[in-house]
Amino acid sequence: MAVVTLIPTLARVLSKHSLLSPLLSVTSFRRFYRGDSPTDSQKDMIEIPLPPWQERTDESIETKRARLLYESRKRGMLENCILLSLFAKEYLHNMTEKQLNLYDRLINEPSNDWDIYYWATEAKPAPEIFENEVMELLREFTKNKNKEQRLRAPDLEYLFEKPR
């Protein structure tokens, strides 16, 4: 009787292993920003290929602002959700079209949200392509010189207020 109850358990364990082993044998364990080579500490990361970023030239300025506001709020990590949504609330409505394009590239081209966070906090240097006026603005904002509490993304009520 014990052998009969053991067989389904053994079958489940073997089926889980047999499902994962082909994936693990062909998966590349790398993650890096385009153009950078992985360091030893990054060799255990799984690389997920993303389509290359393309500038949207057929988009109106208001549509771009709305999209960037959404993309600033919906990130892959909480730290950037908070940081970028507060930054967008403060600066997005006053940005020129050129600055909006630079911000679009900054938040959408890197394949890893941690890169953006490290560049904004100056923990790592940003690639030359991202060294621009918007990155400087983001770095200054990240320093939080006014010592504001930044514990969560802003509520959306400010979208319905009259512009300052």
Swiss-Prot record:
Name its GO BP terms in alphabetical order: canonical Wnt signaling pathway; epithelial to mesenchymal transition; mitochondrial electron transport, succinate to ubiquinone; mitochondrial respiratory chain complex II assembly; negative regulation of canonical Wnt signaling pathway; negative regulation of epithelial to mesenchymal transition; protein-FAD linkage; tricarboxylic acid cycle
Q: Would I find Mitochondrion among this entry's keywords?
A: yes
The UniProt record lists the keyword Protease: no
Location within or outside the cell: Mitochondrion matrix
What keywords are assigned to this protein? Chaperone, Mitochondrion, Transit peptide
Which cysteines share a disulfide bond? none
Record-linked InterPro entries: SDH, SDH_sf, SDHAF2
Q: Which Pfam families match?
A: Sdh5
User: Can you list the GO cellular component terms from the UniProt entry?
Assistant: mitochondrial matrix; mitochondrion
Organelle transit peptide residues: 1-27
Q: Which family does it belong to?
A: Belongs to the SDHAF2 family.
HAMAP family, sorted: SDHAF2
What is this protein's function per UniProt?
A: Plays an essential role in the assembly of succinate dehydrogenase (SDH), an enzyme complex (also referred to as respiratory complex II) that is a component of both the tricarboxylic acid (TCA) cycle and the mitochondrial electron transport chain, and which couples the oxidation of succinate to fumarate with the reduction of ubiquinone (coenzyme Q) to ubiquinol. Required for flavinylation (covalent attachment of FAD) of the flavoprotein subunit SDHA of the SDH catalytic dimer.
> How is the subunit organization of this protein annotated in UniProt?
Interacts with SDHA within the SDH catalytic dimer.
Q: What is this protein called?
A: Succinate dehydrogenase assembly factor 2, mitochondrial
- State the organism of origin: Rattus norvegicus
Lineage of producing organism: Eukaryota, Metazoa, Chordata, Craniata, Vertebrata
Name the gene.
Answer: Sdhaf2
